[in-house]
Amino acid sequence: MGLHLYDTRRRRVRPFEPLRPGHVGVYVCGPTVQAAPHVGHIRTALPFDLLRRWLVQSGRSVTFVQNVTDIDDKIIINADRDGTSVWELATRQTRAFDDAYRTLGILPPTIQPRATGHIPEMIALVSALVEGGYAYASGGSVWFRVGAFADYGALSHQRPDAMQPSVEAEPGKADPRDFALWKAARPGEPFWSSPWGDGRPGWHLECSAMAGKYLGPVFDIHGGGLDLVFPHHENERAQTVCAATARPASNAASADSPGPGGGEPGGGEPSSGEMARYWMHVGLLTTGGTKMSKSLGNSVLVADALDAVRPQVLRYHLLSAHYRSTLEYSAEALAESTAAHDRVETFVRNALDILGGPGEAAALAADEVVSSVAGAQPTVAGARPVPVPGPGGESRLTPRRAWSDFTIAMDDDLAVGRALAALFGAVSQGNQVLSKAHSRELAGWVDVTRRMLNIFGLDPHEQWPTAGAEFRPALDGAMQVVLDLRSAARARRDYAEADAIRSRLAAAGLIVEDTPEGQRWHLA
């Protein structure tokens, strides 16, 4: 089957065919660092992390670019309100976003450009648009001429003549729909020199310039939240396609690129005149049925969310629905995700304990599922593909068949519902053979479970290393002494003492479980 992805521009799922075989260029619109990150930001970022991991697993190298918008009207307003500088606010909140992404296991971008570090590229892009007749200067600002782009509205599937005026209702615009490429300087605001006077870039311009610098005028995948389809991505596409057409052929996508309007009419495949071959958008995160956003005052900060649940659980919950669907965030939904995640994590932990650890499990699993998950962490561009089991044709569920089901689901536009069904099927089968110590069958099930968890960024052994790992041998030894004391209490039928020991350990964050194979412990 191969990977298929839904393309917003074409309104259908299409086979994924990168421009360069074996390599994928991805640009995702990153945060405007005006305030602390909320859960909605993570909801948008995680599906692209999942996609990236799957692309690498499938044998492709990935150049993943995610920008930081560090100059914007909202940043200026918030900095003024807080009595701080724009630069201090932007730097502080950029760190907060980086910390939140890292805490949630999101792989760092290959390139993370800041808008303010790319002003020359933005000025060059505006100059090309002005020279090509697609933009005009007025009062120190520069506006994109929407009427000059015949395909405007194609991404968001709107008719240009039915569109409302842009939010920038300022004098000097030739058409109410025109949007700002360059904004004339205002008193007290940051500015840069330009051929049109002092000013600063418009929001849409920033992403076009940075995507073009690092991925070229045409690249594979452009992503973001559903709320960015219009006007942000529509405007990005318009100015990028027109700039590529206006520039000399050596700087454009192709010497024989079509004029503004890009791909073939009537739903044909995107051509070299497009900005991105595939446009992907993540559905909204809601709370109480209403979109979560700062402007509505119902956003939940990542820091507050992590006071309620572990990072792994939050990551699981935000990935548990298909990326194009709406996902509800509530205490009840988080409780369900906690139970589901704990079931998987408990199986992996118990299985690895029985089998003697990841290395031993991998060796036992070699005959069962061809190769081990050990060392299969997705990495940045250039990573080698991980060996995977071949397609399964078994009538009964086996680790090989479970992986095949998982692969088919992920290749179908990241169908996480079916992928999670394959995961929980593997966990269920593994739990049934959990008592078979050093069983190849158990090793096979835990191996394939960890393969799937690895794609979701949730392998409890590999993806979430415990801080203070150098103290683990000492902790293991100390815990064995305590567990021996508890065993002695049970042997003399002093169950009150045994329960008291377990309760005191639980209060300290150390969970003891009694199993047919003996006592096991793990961190809460």
Swiss-Prot record:
Binds 1 zinc ion per subunit. InterPro entries: Cys-tRNA-ligase, Cys-tRNA-synt_Ia_DALR, Cys-tRNA/MSH_ligase, CysS_C, Rossmann-like_a/b/a_fold, tRNA-synt_1_cat_dom, tRNAsynth_Ia_anticodon-bd. GO terms for cellular component: cytosol. It is an enzyme of class 6 (ligase). Residues 246-258 have a biased composition (Low complexity). Its cofactor is Zn(2+). GO terms for biological process: cysteinyl-tRNA aminoacylation. It comes from the Bacteria. Its main location: cytoplasm. Residues 259-270 have a biased composition (Gly residues). Keywords: Aminoacyl-tRNA synthetase, ATP-binding, Cytoplasm, Ligase, Metal-binding, Nucleotide-binding, Protein biosynthesis, Zinc. Its EC number is 6.1.1.16. A motif ('KMSKS' region) lies at residues 291-295. A motif ('HIGH' region) lies at residues 31-41. It catalyses: tRNA(Cys) + L-cysteine + ATP = L-cysteinyl-tRNA(Cys) + AMP + diphosphate. Zn(2+) binds at residues 29, 207, 232, 236. It is found in: Cytoplasm. Residues 246-273 are annotated as: Disordered. Pfam families: CysS_C (PF23493), tRNA-synt_1e (PF01406). CDD domains: CysRS_core (cd00672). ATP binds at residue 294. One of its GO terms (molecular function) is cysteine-tRNA ligase activity. Belongs to the class-I aminoacyl-tRNA synthetase family. Monomer. This is Cysteine--tRNA ligase.
